[in-house]
């Protein structure tokens, strides 16, 4: 089994750095509750239960899978139920055990993401979905940080494929747009996230390179605001079409 990235090290701050704005999250959840009513749902990478907890509280049957015990412990404290610790590419479920499956911000962390899609297709009867942000924001601060550490000699790339790139491989069967939304962020909050190395791409950056990258970012962005507009897309594929994505991308 290829190595897996566990988010235990950032479990305590994960929700505050990865969650959607409350208004946007409420709209997405409302759409999902309507769509998933009466379905048995598998969430791979359930983590702290950002999606699973409110869906479960709304009466949706969600089974979660994860490898990070600390992330799941936080979810359990929030009311998360029905979690299995397992590898996403080797799911411990019978074929066609679920109506619907989902991943969100998971596949880019998994080098054998094609095997994960194959497993999702195996255990799912109907559809797979993910929530994608379509935005005019280009993550300026994070991109500047990445450019600075790369210029200093450190290069890192995600081992897998971002869910947001799946539609480029195969046209979705159905998209539910949610939004648009307009938000204002304080750059200081993002600077703090970067300084704490909350993103997996930062975890192995040498200390000196990290420190030197943060200095010009603080000087440029401290005290400023970042505004952006975005729409969320709840994007669905029929289970059998995941096989097309997985097999067409085999090296």
Describe every region a protein language model picked out.
Residues 42-44, 48-90:
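Class I SAM-dependent methyltransferase SAM/SAH-binding core
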Residues 102:
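A conserved beta-strand element that flanks and buttresses the S-adenosyl-L-methionine
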Residues 105-109:
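Short catalytic micro-motifs in class I SAM-dependent methyltransferases
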Residues 114-128:
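A short glycine-rich, Lys/Arg-flanked "PGG" loop and its adjoining helix->strand segment in the class I
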Residues 156-172:
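Short alpha-helix
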